[in-house]
Amino acid sequence: MEMASAFTLNVRLDNIAIITIDVPDEKMNTLKAEFASQVRAIIKQLRENKELRGVVFISAKPDNFIAGADINMIGNCKTAQEAEALARQGQQLMAEINALPIPVIAAIHGACLGGGLELALACHGRVCTDDPKTVLGLPEVQLGLLPGSGGTQRLPRLIGVSTALEMILTGKQLRAKQALKLGLVDDVVPHSILLEAAVELAKKDRPSSRPLPVRERILAGPLGRALLFKMVGKKTEHKTQGNYPATERILEVVETGLAQGTSSGYDAEARAFGELAMTPQSQALRSIFFASTDVKKDPGSDAPPAPLNSVGILGGGLMGGGIAYVTACKAGLPVRIKDINPQGINHALKYSWDQLEGKVRRRHLKASERDKQLALISGTTDYRGFAHRDLIIEAVFENLELKQQMVAEVEQNCAAHTIFASNTSSLPIGDIAAHAARPEQVIGLHFFSPVEKMPLVEIIPHAGTSAQTIATTVKLAKKQGKTPIVVRDKAGFYVNRILAPYINEAIRMLTEGERVEHIDAALVKFGFPVGPIQLLDEVGIDTGTKIIPVLEAAYGERFSAPANVVSSILNDDRKGRKNGRGFYLYGQKGRKSKKQVDPAIYPLIGAQGQGRLSAPQVAERCVMLMLNEAVRCVDEQVIRSVRDGDIGAVFGIGFPPFLGGPFRYIDSLGAGEVVAIMQRLATQYGSRFTPCERLVEMGARGESFWKTTATDLQ
């Protein structure tokens, strides 16, 4: 049976050809290799019709133009040559579109990303809608790749090399107004007149490319170009620490095209695409993409979720304010905040105001839309307005009696169906539900700070939580724009449990004489966004270390922190960035202020700060303990799968994405090699490095956690 076409040609009475893109049975349009013949057949018809005045590409999907190429095509390539051939096929198709003798216009509404933007770049003009759903970008770098269908060559010539490099190197997505300002699109119109605006543009002569800004013209010359690439290269190296080969290849390919012409540029682009597709970094990044897509489809349980019409929040502090923001402004649900203090409510409202006002200032949001979203949030010092809330999120202090009291109050003041979700980071959910009248409706919902930025949430059912409560909480998390993983109700849950030994080891190395900045730099070089000591300062030393005694009580001395170090630091009133002094000292300008290591920290903890270990040795000690604990979490079924374990570590603590998560990293090293490293470290530094039984068994049998495919487990 012949596959239904994703591209349909209709010629209007005014001799404008409309090519409608609608991939059958898919919510998103993605480009697949088999579509090439369909597009070529249409191009042939266009060339044969001498009456045609212009062509318009438009999508039939309600919220996307083309979301990119189908990534599975890359996974199917076994060699760099096969992936290179795929890129050349894409380049050739775009060249044929571009070579049409009549104006070709892309009418863009919704996501226009990757191969979708490359198709739009091959057109002679572009019109997009002013809808917030409309975004344009080349995100291939986030998969360890570069644009392979001409994007590295066409974009710099259209908008200038420095602006194009920023887009391609970061995967940054532009909204309609930004795209118009940069010259990426020729017009921005309301959705209702998109087709007519594109048709009018197609009836004119080919749109002439507008002149580049003076700065971009200077940077396009040999001298300006040399300076630009040197500067951008240094900045990129600092940011990636050399861990992402795609960024180096992007610079090389763009420069080749500008210096030697487009023919050489296209050659370099296809070759680099093929080689990058085979790198372990790209394979790991693609595995994270597939795993996160998979998690987003996971309902959490077999039961249908209950309706979600409104949410209540207990506590207007930093977490409560952040949760209110994502619930109202991302999920679009009415939120009522209860705090014993009116100032707490004001704080939470200001939190959302600050977030939304920032978007208005950056022109990402209209003031009217800001006001509409803010109107969803209200506050109270009692339980008025809570009677019919479907789900209550508790974000009060980490105190068991207080949380149990909150459960009792919610059961007394809310509906019989209301779910109680605790944002605890350390207390067992079973204990919080111990005196509940409806324990099946009590669950953990652990957000990470800052709530609006951190993509992960942990959902923690206790033994008595119902399947419907799990499904409803998962549904809410997804509405809030989060990636949820369901974890077992054991001390530390998953993320904090694997993070604690990593941070403990960093503190232990401090007491042995390693310097703060050396430890942090070693882990940043390894691939973490910040080092462990800085992370502790950012989270708050008091907050970050609160869980250590809980974990030590549950799992024994492998979780013990170096004696008296934490208490010495806290007794010296060091809480980290929030009070201006921790391991680092901070200026007065809030989060943007510069930090420097406080030399007084060394005598305070009885250390010299001399340092004897190399950066790889420092990283090895921290990371191996994290890997070992992650394997224990699989063994104890704290996480439901290694997929969730990899996603949890990458999205929850910034485990290096190019390594694919703890379990993919173990697979890449080999379980046997990880065991050998840990046994060596155990001999040198003590029994906390003893590899767990599961790891030893896997090493002996030569087993791995993942199969070779992107999402299947062994």
Swiss-Prot record:
- Source taxon at top rank: Bacteria
An annotated Gene Ontology molecular function = 3-hydroxybutyryl-CoA epimerase activity
Map out region (3-hydroxyacyl-CoA dehydrogenase) in residue numbers.
Answer: 306-714
Choose one Gene Ontology CC annotation of this protein and give it.
Answer: cytoplasm
Keywords from UniProt, A to Z, are: Cytoplasm, Fatty acid metabolism, Isomerase, Lipid degradation, Lipid metabolism, Lyase, Multifunctional enzyme, NAD, Oxidoreductase
Q: Where in the cell is it found?
A: Cytoplasm
Enumerate the Pfam families for this protein. Answer: 3HCDH, 3HCDH_N, ECH_1
GO biological process, alphabetically ordered: fatty acid beta-oxidation
Query: Which reactions does this protein catalyse?
Result: a (3S)-3-hydroxyacyl-CoA = a (2E)-enoyl-CoA + H2O; a 4-saturated-(3S)-3-hydroxyacyl-CoA = a (3E)-enoyl-CoA + H2O; a (3S)-3-hydroxyacyl-CoA + NAD(+) = a 3-oxoacyl-CoA + NADH + H(+); (3S)-3-hydroxybutanoyl-CoA = (3R)-3-hydroxybutanoyl-CoA
InterPro entries with a match to the protein in the record = 3-OHacyl-CoA_DH_CS (IPR006180), 3-OHacyl-CoA_DH_NAD-bd (IPR006176), 3HC_DH_C (IPR006108), 6-PGluconate_DH-like_C_sf (IPR008927), ClpP/crotonase-like_dom_sf (IPR029045), Enoyl-CoA_hydra/iso (IPR001753), FA_oxidation_alpha_subunit (IPR050136), FadJ (IPR012802)
* Matching PROSITE patterns: 3HCDH
Enoyl-CoA hydratase: annotated segments: 1-190
Family the entry assigns = In the N-terminal section; belongs to the enoyl-CoA hydratase/isomerase family.
The annotated subunit structure for this chain is: Heterotetramer of two alpha chains (FadJ) and two beta chains (FadI).
This molecule's function is given as: Catalyzes the formation of a hydroxyacyl-CoA by addition of water on enoyl-CoA. Also exhibits 3-hydroxyacyl-CoA epimerase and 3-hydroxyacyl-CoA dehydrogenase activities.
The identity of this protein, by name, is Fatty acid oxidation complex subunit alpha
